[in-house]
Amino acid sequence: MAETNRAVIKLREKFSASVLDVKEFRGEVTVTVKREDIVEICNFLKSSLAYNLCTDVTAVDYLGKQEPRFMVVYNLYSIPNKDRLRVKAGVPEAGCSIDTVSCVWSAANWLEREVYDLMGVVFNNHPDLRRILMTDDWVGHPLRKDYPLQGPGREPYKGRLS
Amino acid sequence: MASTEIMTVNMGPQHPSTHGVLRLVVELDGEIIQKITPHIGYLHRGVEKLSEHRTYHQTIPLTDRLDYLAPMHNNLGYVLAVEKLLGIEVPERAQTIRVILAELTRLKSHLVWVACHALDIGAMTVFIYAFREREMVMSLYEKISGARMTSSYFRVGGLSSDVYDGFEKDVREIVDTFPGHFDTYEGLLTKNTIWLNRTVGNGVISAEDAIDYGITGPALRGSGVDWDLRRDNPYSGYEKYQFKVPVGEKCDTFDRYKVRLVEMREAVNIIRQALDSLKPGPVLADAPQVTYPPKENVYNTIEGLIHHFKIASEGFPVPEGEVYQGVENPKGELGYYIVSDGGNKPYRMRIRPPSFVNLGAIEKMAKGSMIADLVAVIGTLDIVLGEIDR
Protein backbone atom coordinates (compact mmCIF):
# COMPACT_ATOMS: atom_id res chain seq x y z
CA MET A 1 0.00 0.00 0.00
CA ALA A 2 2.89 2.36 0.70
CA GLU A 3 3.93 2.02 -2.94
CA THR A 4 0.47 3.00 -4.16
CA ASN A 5 0.25 6.04 -1.88
CA ARG A 6 -0.34 9.15 -3.96
CA ALA A 7 2.28 11.22 -2.17
CA VAL A 8 4.89 8.47 -2.40
CA ILE A 9 4.38 8.08 -6.15
CA LYS A 10 4.66 11.83 -6.73
CA LEU A 11 7.72 12.14 -4.51
CA ARG A 12 9.44 9.25 -6.29
CA GLU A 13 8.66 10.88 -9.63
CA LYS A 14 9.93 14.27 -8.71
CA PHE A 15 12.66 13.62 -6.13
CA SER A 16 13.83 10.12 -7.06
CA ALA A 17 17.36 10.80 -5.86
CA SER A 18 16.31 12.12 -2.45
CA VAL A 19 13.77 9.50 -1.40
CA LEU A 20 15.85 7.04 0.60
CA ASP A 21 13.21 4.79 2.09
CA VAL A 22 9.45 4.26 2.15
CA LYS A 23 7.84 2.28 4.94
CA GLU A 24 4.36 1.41 6.05
CA PHE A 25 3.41 0.35 9.57
CA ARG A 26 -0.15 0.06 10.92
CA GLY A 27 -1.46 1.97 7.91
CA GLU A 28 0.87 4.93 8.35
CA VAL A 29 3.28 5.85 5.58
CA THR A 30 6.75 7.13 6.42
CA VAL A 31 9.08 8.58 3.81
CA THR A 32 12.74 9.07 4.64
CA VAL A 33 14.44 11.74 2.55
CA LYS A 34 17.85 13.38 2.28
CA ARG A 35 18.19 16.32 4.63
CA GLU A 36 19.62 18.61 1.93
CA ASP A 37 16.30 18.60 0.03
CA ILE A 38 13.91 18.90 2.98
CA VAL A 39 12.71 22.44 2.23
CA GLU A 40 12.15 21.70 -1.45
CA ILE A 41 10.23 18.52 -0.64
CA CYS A 42 8.11 20.21 2.03
CA ASN A 43 7.33 23.05 -0.34
CA PHE A 44 6.22 20.54 -2.95
CA LEU A 45 4.12 18.59 -0.42
CA LYS A 46 2.38 21.77 0.69
CA SER A 47 1.79 23.44 -2.66
CA SER A 48 1.13 20.44 -4.94
CA LEU A 49 -0.21 17.76 -2.62
CA ALA A 50 -2.13 19.98 -0.14
CA TYR A 51 -0.36 18.88 3.04
CA ASN A 52 -1.30 22.23 4.48
CA LEU A 53 -1.18 21.44 8.20
CA CYS A 54 2.21 20.85 9.76
CA THR A 55 0.99 18.85 12.73
CA ASP A 56 4.30 18.25 14.38
CA VAL A 57 8.05 18.56 14.04
CA THR A 58 10.13 16.45 16.37
CA ALA A 59 13.33 14.41 16.49
CA VAL A 60 14.46 10.99 17.68
CA ASP A 61 17.91 10.32 19.08
CA TYR A 62 19.25 6.92 17.93
CA LEU A 63 22.47 7.09 19.93
CA GLY A 64 24.53 3.97 19.25
CA LYS A 65 21.64 2.32 17.41
CA GLN A 66 21.89 3.64 13.89
CA GLU A 67 23.62 6.23 11.77
CA PRO A 68 22.92 9.10 11.33
CA ARG A 69 22.29 9.71 15.02
CA PHE A 70 19.26 12.01 14.81
CA MET A 71 16.11 11.63 12.82
CA VAL A 72 14.03 14.79 12.39
CA VAL A 73 10.38 13.80 11.97
CA TYR A 74 7.64 15.86 10.30
CA ASN A 75 4.06 14.72 10.84
CA LEU A 76 1.96 16.29 8.13
CA TYR A 77 -1.76 16.38 7.54
CA SER A 78 -3.84 17.38 4.57
CA ILE A 79 -7.13 18.96 5.60
CA PRO A 80 -8.71 18.75 2.10
CA ASN A 81 -7.66 15.10 1.54
CA LYS A 82 -7.92 13.92 5.18
CA ASP A 83 -4.61 12.19 4.78
CA ARG A 84 -1.52 11.85 6.94
CA LEU A 85 2.09 11.56 5.90
CA ARG A 86 5.28 11.31 7.88
CA VAL A 87 8.52 12.63 6.45
CA LYS A 88 11.84 11.92 8.11
CA ALA A 89 15.36 13.16 7.49
CA GLY A 90 18.51 11.88 9.13
CA VAL A 91 20.92 14.34 10.73
CA PRO A 92 24.43 13.21 11.75
CA GLU A 93 26.01 14.14 15.06
CA ALA A 94 28.82 16.05 13.38
CA GLY A 95 27.30 19.06 11.66
CA CYS A 96 24.04 18.57 13.49
CA SER A 97 21.86 20.85 11.39
CA ILE A 98 19.04 20.87 8.89
CA ASP A 99 17.31 23.66 6.97
CA THR A 100 14.25 25.19 8.58
CA VAL A 101 10.79 24.61 7.14
CA SER A 102 9.31 27.55 9.04
CA CYS A 103 9.24 29.35 5.67
CA VAL A 104 6.80 26.65 4.50
CA TRP A 105 4.58 26.42 7.59
CA SER A 106 4.72 29.07 10.33
CA ALA A 107 3.77 26.32 12.80
CA ALA A 108 7.28 24.91 12.40
CA ASN A 109 8.76 28.01 14.02
CA TRP A 110 8.02 27.09 17.62
CA LEU A 111 8.19 23.34 17.01
CA GLU A 112 11.71 23.64 15.60
CA ARG A 113 12.75 25.83 18.49
CA GLU A 114 11.64 23.06 20.82
CA VAL A 115 13.64 20.44 18.90
CA TYR A 116 16.67 22.72 18.99
CA ASP A 117 16.23 23.29 22.71
CA LEU A 118 15.71 19.69 23.78
CA MET A 119 17.64 17.74 21.13
CA GLY A 120 20.29 20.19 19.98
CA VAL A 121 19.51 19.99 16.28
CA VAL A 122 20.27 23.37 14.65
CA PHE A 123 17.84 24.68 12.05
CA ASN A 124 19.62 26.74 9.41
CA ASN A 125 18.00 30.06 8.42
CA HIS A 126 15.50 29.84 11.28
CA PRO A 127 14.19 33.38 11.98
CA ASP A 128 14.36 33.14 15.77
CA LEU A 129 16.32 30.12 16.99
CA ARG A 130 16.33 30.52 20.76
CA ARG A 131 15.67 28.07 23.57
CA ILE A 132 11.98 27.87 24.28
CA LEU A 133 11.37 25.53 27.23
CA MET A 134 14.68 25.76 29.08
CA THR A 135 16.35 28.96 30.31
CA ASP A 136 18.76 30.74 27.95
CA ASP A 137 21.84 29.71 29.94
CA TRP A 138 20.93 26.05 30.21
CA VAL A 139 23.73 23.64 29.33
CA GLY A 140 22.94 20.51 27.34
CA HIS A 141 19.89 19.14 25.59
CA PRO A 142 17.64 17.15 27.94
CA LEU A 143 15.98 14.80 25.47
CA ARG A 144 19.27 13.40 24.13
CA LYS A 145 19.83 9.80 25.13
CA ASP A 146 23.19 10.62 26.75
CA TYR A 147 21.59 13.25 28.99
CA PRO A 148 20.92 11.61 32.37
CA LEU A 149 17.36 11.33 33.64
CA GLN A 150 18.31 12.89 36.96
CA GLY A 151 19.95 15.92 35.33
CA PRO A 152 23.64 16.67 34.87
CA GLY A 153 26.18 16.69 37.70
CA ARG A 154 24.14 14.49 40.00
CA GLU A 155 24.99 11.10 41.34
CA PRO A 156 22.48 8.80 39.66
CA TYR A 157 19.77 7.53 41.98
CA LYS A 158 20.28 3.79 42.26
CA GLY A 159 16.63 3.00 42.84
CA ARG A 160 13.73 2.09 40.61
CA LEU A 161 14.07 4.82 38.03
CA SER A 162 17.76 4.67 37.18
CA MET B 1 4.94 65.98 15.42
CA ALA B 2 5.33 64.49 18.83
CA SER B 3 7.74 61.59 18.98
CA THR B 4 6.45 58.29 20.30
CA GLU B 5 8.26 55.94 22.59
CA ILE B 6 7.81 52.19 22.80
CA MET B 7 7.11 50.94 26.28
CA THR B 8 7.84 47.37 27.32
CA VAL B 9 5.45 45.78 29.78
CA ASN B 10 5.70 42.40 31.48
CA MET B 11 2.35 40.70 31.53
CA GLY B 12 2.43 37.72 33.85
CA PRO B 13 3.51 35.32 35.26
CA GLN B 14 1.34 36.58 38.11
CA HIS B 15 -1.30 38.24 35.98
CA PRO B 16 -4.65 36.53 36.67
CA SER B 17 -5.40 36.05 32.98
CA THR B 18 -2.12 34.34 32.08
CA HIS B 19 -3.28 31.12 33.70
CA GLY B 20 -0.19 30.02 35.56
CA VAL B 21 3.37 30.57 34.46
CA LEU B 22 2.96 32.33 31.12
CA ARG B 23 4.83 35.60 30.79
CA LEU B 24 4.26 37.90 27.85
CA VAL B 25 6.73 40.68 27.20
CA VAL B 26 4.56 43.19 25.39
CA GLU B 27 5.95 46.18 23.52
CA LEU B 28 3.41 48.97 23.44
CA ASP B 29 2.95 52.13 21.46
CA GLY B 30 0.48 53.87 23.74
CA GLU B 31 -2.01 51.10 24.28
CA ILE B 32 -1.45 49.45 20.90
CA ILE B 33 0.47 46.17 20.88
CA GLN B 34 3.54 46.29 18.63
CA LYS B 35 5.23 43.03 19.54
CA ILE B 36 4.71 40.12 21.92
CA THR B 37 7.47 37.83 23.13
CA PRO B 38 5.98 34.89 25.02
CA HIS B 39 8.05 33.18 27.71
CA ILE B 40 6.15 30.01 28.30
CA GLY B 41 7.26 29.23 31.80
CA TYR B 42 9.28 26.63 33.50
CA LEU B 43 6.99 23.94 34.83
CA HIS B 44 9.13 21.10 33.46
CA ARG B 45 7.63 17.85 34.52
CA GLY B 46 9.70 16.24 31.76
CA VAL B 47 6.96 13.82 30.72
CA GLU B 48 8.62 12.84 27.44
CA LYS B 49 11.94 12.04 29.12
CA LEU B 50 10.29 10.21 32.03
CA SER B 51 8.24 8.02 29.73
CA GLU B 52 11.44 6.66 28.18
CA HIS B 53 12.24 5.21 31.59
CA ARG B 54 8.86 3.72 32.48
CA THR B 55 6.84 0.84 31.11
CA TYR B 56 3.86 1.52 28.89
CA HIS B 57 1.37 1.14 31.73
CA GLN B 58 3.38 3.28 34.09
CA THR B 59 3.24 6.16 31.62
CA ILE B 60 -0.57 6.48 31.80
CA PRO B 61 -0.59 8.53 35.05
CA LEU B 62 1.92 10.93 33.50
CA THR B 63 -0.34 11.66 30.55
CA ASP B 64 -3.39 12.86 32.45
CA ARG B 65 -1.33 15.48 34.26
CA LEU B 66 -0.54 17.17 30.94
CA ASP B 67 -3.85 18.92 30.59
CA TYR B 68 -5.45 18.70 34.00
CA LEU B 69 -8.74 19.98 32.62
CA ALA B 70 -9.12 17.07 30.22
CA PRO B 71 -7.29 14.11 31.77
CA MET B 72 -9.34 11.38 30.12
CA HIS B 73 -8.67 12.78 26.66
CA ASN B 74 -4.94 12.63 27.30
CA ASN B 75 -5.24 9.04 28.52
CA LEU B 76 -7.31 8.20 25.49
CA GLY B 77 -4.76 9.49 22.96
CA TYR B 78 -1.97 7.62 24.69
CA VAL B 79 -3.71 4.26 25.02
CA LEU B 80 -4.95 4.49 21.43
CA ALA B 81 -1.38 5.04 20.24
CA VAL B 82 -0.09 2.05 22.22
CA GLU B 83 -3.00 -0.09 21.02
CA LYS B 84 -2.17 0.89 17.47
CA LEU B 85 1.46 -0.15 18.01
CA LEU B 86 0.33 -3.48 19.45
CA GLY B 87 -2.39 -3.96 16.85
CA ILE B 88 -5.10 -4.92 19.34
CA GLU B 89 -8.82 -4.38 19.10
CA VAL B 90 -10.81 -2.89 21.99
CA PRO B 91 -14.27 -4.36 22.83
CA GLU B 92 -17.31 -2.33 21.90
CA ARG B 93 -18.50 -1.61 25.44
CA ALA B 94 -15.11 -0.18 26.38
CA GLN B 95 -15.13 2.00 23.27
CA THR B 96 -18.60 3.35 24.03
CA ILE B 97 -17.70 4.14 27.65
CA ARG B 98 -14.53 5.84 26.41
CA VAL B 99 -16.60 8.06 24.13
CA ILE B 100 -19.05 8.94 26.93
CA LEU B 101 -16.23 9.86 29.28
CA ALA B 102 -14.29 11.73 26.60
CA GLU B 103 -17.33 13.87 25.83
CA LEU B 104 -18.03 14.47 29.53
CA THR B 105 -14.42 15.57 29.77
CA ARG B 106 -14.97 17.95 26.88
CA LEU B 107 -17.88 19.46 28.80
CA LYS B 108 -15.74 19.70 31.92
CA SER B 109 -12.92 21.40 30.07
CA HIS B 110 -15.14 23.81 28.16
CA LEU B 111 -16.92 24.73 31.40
CA VAL B 112 -13.64 25.86 32.90
CA TRP B 113 -12.87 27.70 29.70
CA VAL B 114 -16.19 29.61 29.67
CA ALA B 115 -15.81 30.35 33.37
CA CYS B 116 -12.26 31.69 33.14
CA HIS B 117 -12.74 33.46 29.83
CA ALA B 118 -15.77 35.30 31.21
CA LEU B 119 -13.93 36.09 34.43
CA ASP B 120 -10.91 37.43 32.50
CA ILE B 121 -13.22 39.81 30.69
CA GLY B 122 -15.04 40.70 33.89
CA ALA B 123 -18.16 38.54 34.19
CA MET B 124 -18.22 36.90 37.57
CA THR B 125 -21.57 35.10 37.56
CA VAL B 126 -20.75 32.72 34.71
CA PHE B 127 -17.63 31.67 36.56
CA ILE B 128 -19.57 30.58 39.62
CA TYR B 129 -22.30 28.85 37.60
CA ALA B 130 -19.91 26.92 35.36
CA PHE B 131 -17.85 25.66 38.27
CA ARG B 132 -21.05 24.51 39.96
CA GLU B 133 -21.95 22.41 36.90
CA ARG B 134 -18.41 21.10 36.54
CA GLU B 135 -18.74 19.67 40.03
CA MET B 136 -21.27 17.14 38.68
CA VAL B 137 -18.74 15.79 36.21
CA MET B 138 -16.04 15.81 38.86
CA SER B 139 -18.08 13.68 41.25
CA LEU B 140 -18.78 11.27 38.39
CA TYR B 141 -15.01 11.03 37.83
CA GLU B 142 -14.60 10.30 41.52
CA LYS B 143 -17.18 7.55 41.51
CA ILE B 144 -15.59 5.92 38.47
CA SER B 145 -11.91 6.13 39.23
CA GLY B 146 -11.53 7.33 42.81
CA ALA B 147 -9.87 10.57 41.69
CA ARG B 148 -11.54 13.87 40.94
CA MET B 149 -8.96 15.17 38.52
CA THR B 150 -6.24 12.74 37.49
CA SER B 151 -8.31 9.68 36.82
CA SER B 152 -5.91 7.36 34.90
CA TYR B 153 -9.00 5.31 34.17
CA PHE B 154 -8.23 4.01 30.68
CA ARG B 155 -5.88 1.08 30.20
CA VAL B 156 -4.08 -0.29 27.20
CA GLY B 157 -6.72 -2.67 25.85
CA GLY B 158 -9.76 -1.10 27.49
CA LEU B 159 -10.69 0.26 30.90
CA SER B 160 -9.27 -0.34 34.36
CA SER B 161 -12.68 -1.61 35.50
CA ASP B 162 -16.28 -1.54 34.39
CA VAL B 163 -18.43 1.42 35.44
CA TYR B 164 -20.44 1.27 38.67
CA ASP B 165 -24.15 0.47 38.92
CA GLY B 166 -26.16 3.60 38.39
CA PHE B 167 -23.58 5.15 36.04
CA GLU B 168 -26.14 5.50 33.29
CA LYS B 169 -28.59 7.24 35.61
CA ASP B 170 -25.94 9.73 36.72
CA VAL B 171 -24.88 10.50 33.15
CA ARG B 172 -28.50 10.91 32.05
CA GLU B 173 -29.00 13.43 34.84
CA ILE B 174 -26.05 15.42 33.51
CA VAL B 175 -27.18 15.38 29.88
CA ASP B 176 -30.73 16.27 30.87
CA THR B 177 -29.80 19.30 32.96
CA PHE B 178 -26.82 20.69 31.06
CA PRO B 179 -28.56 22.18 27.99
CA GLY B 180 -30.55 24.42 30.36
CA HIS B 181 -27.32 25.59 31.93
CA PHE B 182 -25.87 26.40 28.51
CA ASP B 183 -28.93 28.55 27.87
CA THR B 184 -28.14 30.41 31.09
CA TYR B 185 -24.56 31.14 29.99
CA GLU B 186 -25.75 32.29 26.60
CA GLY B 187 -28.39 34.44 28.22
CA LEU B 188 -25.74 36.08 30.35
CA LEU B 189 -23.18 36.58 27.59
CA THR B 190 -24.26 36.23 23.97
CA LYS B 191 -26.26 39.47 23.74
CA ASN B 192 -24.48 41.28 26.54
CA THR B 193 -23.19 44.59 25.16
CA ILE B 194 -20.00 44.55 27.19
CA TRP B 195 -19.26 40.98 26.12
CA LEU B 196 -19.89 41.84 22.47
CA ASN B 197 -17.67 44.91 22.61
CA ARG B 198 -14.84 42.91 24.10
CA THR B 199 -15.06 39.91 21.77
CA VAL B 200 -16.45 40.86 18.35
CA GLY B 201 -13.67 41.74 15.93
CA ASN B 202 -11.02 40.94 18.51
CA GLY B 203 -8.14 38.50 17.94
CA VAL B 204 -8.97 37.94 14.28
CA ILE B 205 -6.98 35.27 12.44
CA SER B 206 -7.95 34.22 8.93
CA ALA B 207 -8.54 30.59 7.99
CA GLU B 208 -5.37 30.53 5.90
CA ASP B 209 -3.21 31.96 8.67
CA ALA B 210 -4.77 29.65 11.25
CA ILE B 211 -3.84 26.57 9.21
CA ASP B 212 -0.39 28.00 8.53
CA TYR B 213 0.22 28.41 12.27
CA GLY B 214 -1.00 24.88 12.88
CA ILE B 215 -3.90 25.96 15.08
CA THR B 216 -6.33 23.12 15.73
CA GLY B 217 -9.57 22.49 17.56
CA PRO B 218 -12.22 25.12 18.34
CA ALA B 219 -9.76 27.93 17.63
CA LEU B 220 -9.35 26.66 14.05
CA ARG B 221 -13.05 26.04 13.56
CA GLY B 222 -13.75 29.55 14.82
CA SER B 223 -11.80 30.69 11.77
CA GLY B 224 -14.20 28.83 9.51
CA VAL B 225 -12.19 25.69 8.78
CA ASP B 226 -14.53 22.70 8.83
CA TRP B 227 -12.21 20.12 10.35
CA ASP B 228 -12.69 17.81 13.31
CA LEU B 229 -10.63 14.67 13.95
CA ARG B 230 -13.62 12.88 15.47
CA ARG B 231 -15.36 13.07 12.11
CA ASP B 232 -12.42 13.14 9.70
CA ASN B 233 -10.13 10.54 11.31
CA PRO B 234 -12.55 8.68 13.56
CA TYR B 235 -11.30 6.66 16.52
CA SER B 236 -13.09 4.76 19.32
CA GLY B 237 -16.18 4.38 17.15
CA TYR B 238 -16.94 8.08 16.67
CA GLU B 239 -18.08 7.30 13.13
CA LYS B 240 -21.26 5.77 14.61
CA TYR B 241 -22.52 9.01 16.13
CA GLN B 242 -24.30 11.87 14.44
CA PHE B 243 -23.06 15.30 15.40
CA LYS B 244 -22.56 18.73 13.90
CA VAL B 245 -19.17 20.37 13.62
CA PRO B 246 -19.74 24.08 14.26
CA VAL B 247 -17.65 26.62 12.35
CA GLY B 248 -17.33 30.38 12.67
CA GLU B 249 -17.30 33.10 10.01
CA LYS B 250 -15.65 36.22 11.34
CA CYS B 251 -12.60 34.42 12.79
CA ASP B 252 -12.76 36.48 16.00
CA THR B 253 -13.01 35.79 19.71
CA PHE B 254 -16.79 35.82 19.62
CA ASP B 255 -16.86 33.12 16.93
CA ARG B 256 -14.57 30.90 18.97
CA TYR B 257 -16.88 31.44 21.94
CA LYS B 258 -19.91 30.42 19.89
CA VAL B 259 -18.11 27.38 18.44
CA ARG B 260 -17.25 26.09 21.90
CA LEU B 261 -20.79 26.60 23.18
CA VAL B 262 -22.25 24.67 20.23
CA GLU B 263 -19.61 22.00 20.81
CA MET B 264 -20.85 21.57 24.36
CA ARG B 265 -24.39 21.03 23.11
CA GLU B 266 -23.10 18.54 20.53
CA ALA B 267 -21.15 16.71 23.23
CA VAL B 268 -24.41 16.22 25.10
CA ASN B 269 -25.88 14.82 21.86
CA ILE B 270 -23.05 12.34 21.44
CA ILE B 271 -23.31 11.20 25.06
CA ARG B 272 -27.06 10.57 24.61
CA GLN B 273 -26.44 8.44 21.49
CA ALA B 274 -23.62 6.54 23.17
CA LEU B 275 -25.75 5.84 26.25
CA ASP B 276 -28.51 4.47 24.05
CA SER B 277 -26.09 2.11 22.32
CA LEU B 278 -24.36 0.95 25.53
CA LYS B 279 -24.62 -2.84 25.82
CA PRO B 280 -23.22 -5.24 28.40
CA GLY B 281 -19.97 -6.99 27.54
CA PRO B 282 -16.29 -7.14 28.37
CA VAL B 283 -14.34 -3.93 28.93
CA LEU B 284 -10.87 -5.37 28.31
CA ALA B 285 -9.47 -6.72 25.08
CA ASP B 286 -8.72 -10.41 24.78
CA ALA B 287 -4.96 -9.85 24.91
CA PRO B 288 -3.61 -11.59 28.02
CA GLN B 289 -0.02 -10.57 27.28
CA VAL B 290 -0.97 -6.94 27.69
CA THR B 291 -3.95 -6.63 30.01
CA TYR B 292 -4.11 -7.37 33.71
CA PRO B 293 -5.87 -10.65 34.55
CA PRO B 294 -9.29 -10.44 36.26
CA LYS B 295 -9.04 -9.77 39.99
CA GLU B 296 -10.60 -13.12 41.00
CA ASN B 297 -7.80 -14.92 39.15
CA VAL B 298 -5.17 -12.76 40.84
CA TYR B 299 -6.55 -13.60 44.26
CA ASN B 300 -7.35 -17.26 43.70
CA THR B 301 -4.80 -18.71 41.28
CA ILE B 302 -1.02 -18.65 41.42
CA GLU B 303 -0.77 -18.26 37.61
CA GLY B 304 -2.98 -15.20 37.76
CA LEU B 305 -0.92 -13.73 40.57
CA ILE B 306 2.39 -14.29 38.76
CA HIS B 307 1.00 -12.88 35.54
CA HIS B 308 -0.32 -9.78 37.29
CA PHE B 309 3.02 -9.29 38.99
CA LYS B 310 4.97 -9.67 35.76
CA ILE B 311 2.84 -7.15 33.87
CA ALA B 312 2.97 -4.68 36.73
CA SER B 313 6.73 -4.88 37.21
CA GLU B 314 8.14 -5.74 33.78
CA GLY B 315 5.46 -4.44 31.48
CA PHE B 316 4.97 -6.05 28.09
CA PRO B 317 7.02 -6.01 24.88
CA VAL B 318 5.68 -3.89 22.04
CA PRO B 319 6.51 -4.59 18.36
CA GLU B 320 9.17 -2.45 16.75
CA GLY B 321 7.78 0.47 14.79
CA GLU B 322 6.44 3.98 15.03
CA VAL B 323 2.91 5.37 15.12
CA TYR B 324 1.20 8.71 15.46
CA GLN B 325 -2.24 8.99 16.99
CA GLY B 326 -4.11 12.26 17.21
CA VAL B 327 -7.29 12.82 19.20
CA GLU B 328 -9.63 15.81 19.19
CA ASN B 329 -8.91 17.32 22.58
CA PRO B 330 -11.04 20.22 23.90
CA LYS B 331 -8.07 22.43 22.97
CA GLY B 332 -7.26 20.93 19.60
CA GLU B 333 -5.36 18.00 18.21
CA LEU B 334 -3.42 16.17 20.89
CA GLY B 335 -1.06 13.70 19.26
CA TYR B 336 1.17 10.95 20.54
CA TYR B 337 4.09 9.89 18.37
CA ILE B 338 5.65 6.75 19.82
CA VAL B 339 8.78 5.01 18.56
CA SER B 340 9.18 1.48 19.86
CA ASP B 341 12.40 -0.52 19.66
CA GLY B 342 10.66 -3.73 20.63
CA GLY B 343 11.19 -3.29 24.36
CA ASN B 344 8.81 -2.70 27.25
CA LYS B 345 9.35 1.07 27.33
CA PRO B 346 8.74 3.68 24.64
CA TYR B 347 12.05 4.40 22.92
CA ARG B 348 10.81 7.90 22.22
CA MET B 349 7.46 9.39 23.04
CA ARG B 350 6.59 12.73 21.61
CA ILE B 351 3.47 14.59 22.66
CA ARG B 352 2.05 17.01 20.14
CA PRO B 353 0.49 19.60 22.44
CA PRO B 354 -2.39 21.67 21.04
CA SER B 355 -1.98 24.58 23.49
CA PHE B 356 1.72 24.98 22.64
CA VAL B 357 1.06 25.28 18.91
CA ASN B 358 -2.02 27.48 19.39
CA LEU B 359 -0.10 29.86 21.62
CA GLY B 360 2.51 30.24 18.87
CA ALA B 361 -0.01 32.33 16.95
CA ILE B 362 -0.73 34.80 19.76
CA GLU B 363 1.35 37.57 18.27
CA LYS B 364 -0.36 37.16 14.92
CA MET B 365 -3.75 37.40 16.61
CA ALA B 366 -3.12 40.27 19.00
CA LYS B 367 -0.71 42.54 17.12
CA GLY B 368 -2.22 45.94 16.52
CA SER B 369 -4.99 45.63 19.06
CA MET B 370 -5.24 47.24 22.49
CA ILE B 371 -3.49 45.71 25.47
CA ALA B 372 -6.82 45.24 27.23
CA ASP B 373 -7.93 42.98 24.39
CA LEU B 374 -4.89 40.75 24.83
CA VAL B 375 -6.63 39.34 27.91
CA ALA B 376 -9.53 38.21 25.74
CA VAL B 377 -7.16 36.69 23.17
CA ILE B 378 -5.33 34.61 25.78
CA GLY B 379 -8.68 33.45 27.14
CA THR B 380 -10.03 32.49 23.75
CA LEU B 381 -7.06 30.19 23.05
CA ASP B 382 -7.97 28.17 26.17
CA ILE B 383 -4.37 27.39 27.04
CA VAL B 384 -3.16 25.03 29.75
CA LEU B 385 0.44 25.66 30.71
CA GLY B 386 0.98 22.16 31.97
CA GLU B 387 0.55 20.92 28.44
CA ILE B 388 2.65 23.65 26.86
CA ASP B 389 5.67 22.96 29.04
CA ARG B 390 5.14 19.22 29.52
UniProtKB/Swiss-Prot annotation, chain A:
Catalyzed reactions per annotation: a quinone + NADH + 5 H(+)(in) = a quinol + NAD(+) + 4 H(+)(out)
Transmembrane segments: none
Superkingdom field: Bacteria
Enzyme class: translocase
Compartments in which it is found: Cell inner membrane
GO cellular component: plasma membrane
Keyword field: Cell inner membrane, Cell membrane, Membrane, NAD, Quinone, Translocase, Transport, Ubiquinone
Main location per the UniProt record: membrane
GO MF terms, alphabetically ordered: NADH dehydrogenase (ubiquinone) activity; NADH:ubiquinone reductase (non-electrogenic) activity; quinone binding
Its membrane topology: Peripheral membrane protein
UniProt-listed Enzyme Commission number(s): 7.1.1.-
HAMAP family reported for this sequence: NDH1_NuoC
Family note: Belongs to the complex I 30 kDa subunit family.
Subunit composition and interactions: NDH-1 is composed of 14 different subunits. Subunits NuoB, C, D, E, F, and G constitute the peripheral sector of the complex.
NCBIfam families in the record: NuoC_fam
Task performed by this protein: NDH-1 shuttles electrons from NADH, via FMN and iron-sulfur (Fe-S) centers, to quinones in the respiratory chain. The immediate electron acceptor for the enzyme in this species is believed to be ubiquinone. Couples the redox reaction to proton translocation (for every two electrons transferred, four hydrogen ions are translocated across the cytoplasmic membrane), and thus conserves the redox energy in a proton gradient.
Protein name, UniProt field: NADH-quinone oxidoreductase subunit C
Curated annotation (Swiss-Prot), chain B:
Superkingdom as given in the UniProt entry: Bacteria
Main location: membrane
A single cellular component GO annotation: plasma membrane
Name of a matching Pfam family: Complex1_49kDa
Gene Ontology MF term list: NAD binding; NADH:ubiquinone reductase (non-electrogenic) activity; quinone binding
Location(s) in or outside the cell: Cell inner membrane
Reactions it catalyzes: a quinone + NADH + 5 H(+)(in) = a quinol + NAD(+) + 4 H(+)(out)
Function according to Swiss-Prot or TrEMBL: NDH-1 shuttles electrons from NADH, via FMN and iron-sulfur (Fe-S) centers, to quinones in the respiratory chain. The immediate electron acceptor for the enzyme in this species is believed to be ubiquinone. Couples the redox reaction to proton translocation (for every two electrons transferred, four hydrogen ions are translocated across the cytoplasmic membrane), and thus conserves the redox energy in a proton gradient.
Similarity field: Belongs to the complex I 49 kDa subunit family.
Quaternary organization: NDH-1 is composed of 14 different subunits. Subunits NuoB, C, D, E, F, and G constitute the peripheral sector of the complex.
PANTHER family, per database record: NADH DEHYDROGENASE [UBIQUINONE] IRON-SULFUR PROTEIN 2, MITOCHONDRIAL (PTHR11993:SF10), NADH-UBIQUINONE OXIDOREDUCTASE 49 KDA SUBUNIT (PTHR11993)
Protein name as it appears in the record: NADH-quinone oxidoreductase subunit D
Organism expressing this protein natively: Geobacter metallireducens (strain ATCC 53774 / DSM 7210 / GS-15)
Phylogenetic placement of the source organism: Bacteria, Pseudomonadati, Thermodesulfobacteriota, Desulfuromonadia, Geobacterales
Gene that this sequence comes from: nuoD
